[in-house]
C-alpha cells in the first residue's frame, strides 16, 4: 500500500513543484517585461518627445533669425526679437529637461548640438548688430553664408540626436522582446516537463 501511495505522490509532488516554479518564473518574467515597458514609456519616448520639441523650437529660431533681417521698423524688429528671446528661453528649458535624461551614449550627439547652437547664437549676435546698424549687405552676406552653414550643422546635429534616441528606444524594445521570448520559452519548457 505504501509503495502505491509513493508511486502516486512522487509525480504529484513533482508536478506541484514544477507548477510553483513555473508560476514564480512567470511572475518574475512578467515583472521584468513590465519594468522594461515602463522604462521605454517613461524614459525613451519622453526623451524622444523632448528632442522633437527641441528640434521644433530650434527650427523656429533659425527662421526667426532670417525674419529679423527683413523686419521693417522698430516695432517689427522688436516683435521678432521678442519672439527670438522667447524661443531661446524655450530651448534652454528643453535642454535642461533633456540633460536630466542624458546618458553616455547620447553625450556626443548632444555635445555636437550644444556646440552648433552656441555658434548659431554667436552668429546671430553679429547679424543682429549688422541689422541694428543698417549694414544690410553685411547682414545678408552673413545670413547667406555663415548662418546657413551653422543652421545646416545644427539641423544635422538634431538629426543625430533624434537618431541616437530612436536607436536607444529600439534597443530597449529588443530587450523587452527578448525577455518576452525567454518567458514564453521557460513557460513552454516547464509545461512540457510537467506533461512529460
Model-derived segments and spans:
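Short, Lys/Arg-rich N-terminal segment immediately upstream of the first membrane anchor
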Residues: 1-7
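Juxtamembrane segments flanking the first transmembrane helix
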Residues: 5, 50-52, 56, 89, ...
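Amphipathic alpha-helical segments and their boundaries
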Residues: 8, 12-61, 74, 102-117, ...
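Juxtamembrane amphipathic/coiled-coil helical coupling segments that flank
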Residues: 27-44, 62-69, 94, 98, ...
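Extracytoplasmic ligand-binding sensor domains of the Cache superfamily
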Residues: 74-111
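Long, amphipathic, charge-rich alpha-helical segments that form helical bundles/coiled-coils
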Residues: 109-131
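Selective detector of the "anchor" transmembrane alpha-helix that sits immediately C-terminal
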Residues: 187-196
